[in-house]
């Protein structure tokens, strides 16, 4: 009996394997690809070919695609687009040339500017004819000179302000009293008179206390307490009948220029003047009469 065509050894082995075991053996990749293409319509032959490529081949394809995109991006721009580009030269506006005036022309214009900063149309026309320029140029010159004049005035005002501040400060310092000297001389705790004064000013007393001031001025110079002593803070002040010492307060605070001052007459004078002038009791009686 003639034998059939001989099969490949692998096929013979596969045919001898039972059906159950054959179903468990994985199929070849080609058959799997064909089955996947038939089942999923989204899979294209190009994608299957790319997936079957090795990693170096994929990298080469990606580099080629990137190079082509770069070449397309670096294509020369059209002339129309180049003309629309804005460069530093294109952004500059067209500027007219400045009109240059001679010294005589400037002198003439300055003379008319000093007379009138806002000339009328007739005056502008006359100046344009005499100078040899257009009316617009004359208007521009007057406009620029007015702005320059305002700037100069503003600078002069700013320079004058510090000087005026210095003068006012000097005046305030000259009128500001360096301190006040409250002097209290009392008998049994009663104040005699009060007032305010500085080194460069006379004492300021209330109207009800002017009579006591006149009493102080009328007394003898040896027995009275001189104003210089009070200003220096060395006034010898004592009490009269009770023998108690008077409270003398000397305030040197510069900020308090109008502090109340209680001025009293000193009962005890230097020892060499005890015998001259009225006694302390007589002076005390006069002060009480004035009140």
UniProtKB/Swiss-Prot annotation:
| DNA-binding residues | 94-153
Region (Disordered) location = 41-97
The record's account of tissue expression is: Specifically expressed in oocytes and early embryos.
Q: What molecular functions are annotated in GO for this chain?
A: DNA binding; DNA-binding transcription factor activity, RNA polymerase II-specific
One GO CC term on file: nucleus
- Which biological processes are named by the entry's GO terms? maternal-to-zygotic transition of gene expression
Against SUPFAM superfamilies, the record matches this protein to: Homeodomain-like
Give the UniProt family note. Belongs to the paired homeobox family. Obox subfamily.
Instruction: Give the protein's recorded name.
Output: Oocyte-specific homeobox protein 5
Native organism: Mus musculus
Provide the organism lineage as a comma list: Eukaryota, Metazoa, Chordata, Craniata, Vertebrata
Gene name, per UniProt, is: Obox5
């Amino acid at each position: 009996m003639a034998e059939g065509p001989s099969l490949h050894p692998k096929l013979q082995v596969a045919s001898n394997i039972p059906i159950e075991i054959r179903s468990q053996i994985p199929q070849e990749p080609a058959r799997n690809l064909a089955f996947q293409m038939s089942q999923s319509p989204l899979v294209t032959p190009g994608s299957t070919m790319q997936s079957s490529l090795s990693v170096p081949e994929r990298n080469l394809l990606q580099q080629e695609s990137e190079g082509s995109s770069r070449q397309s991006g670096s294509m020369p721009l059209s002339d129309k687009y180049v003309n629309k580009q804005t460069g530093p030269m294109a952004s500059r506006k067209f500027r007219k040339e400045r009109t240059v005036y001679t010294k005589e022309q400037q002198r003439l214009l300055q003379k008319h500017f000093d007379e009138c900063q806002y000339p009328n149309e007739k005056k502008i026309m006359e100046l344009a004819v005499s100078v040899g320029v257009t009316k617009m140029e004359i208007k521009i010159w007057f406009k620029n000179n007015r702005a320059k004049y305002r700037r100069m005035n503003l600078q002069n005002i700013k320079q004058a302000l510090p000087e005026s501040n210095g003068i006012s400060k000097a005046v305030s310092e000259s009128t500001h009293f360096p301190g006040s000297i409250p002097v209290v001389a009392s008998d049994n705790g009663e104040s005699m008179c009060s007032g305010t004064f500085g080194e460069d000013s006379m004492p300021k007393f209330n109207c009800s206390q002017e009579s006591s001031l006149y009493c102080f001025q009328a007394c003898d110079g040896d027995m009275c307490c001189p104003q210089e002593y009070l200003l220096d803070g060395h006034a010898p002040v004592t009490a009269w009948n009770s023998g108690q010492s008077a409270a003398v307060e000397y305030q040197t605070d510069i900020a308090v220029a109008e502090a109340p001052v209680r001025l009293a007459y000193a009962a005890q004078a230097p020892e060499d003047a005890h015998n001259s002038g009225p006694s302390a009791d007589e002076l005390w009686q006069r002060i009480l009469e004035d009140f």
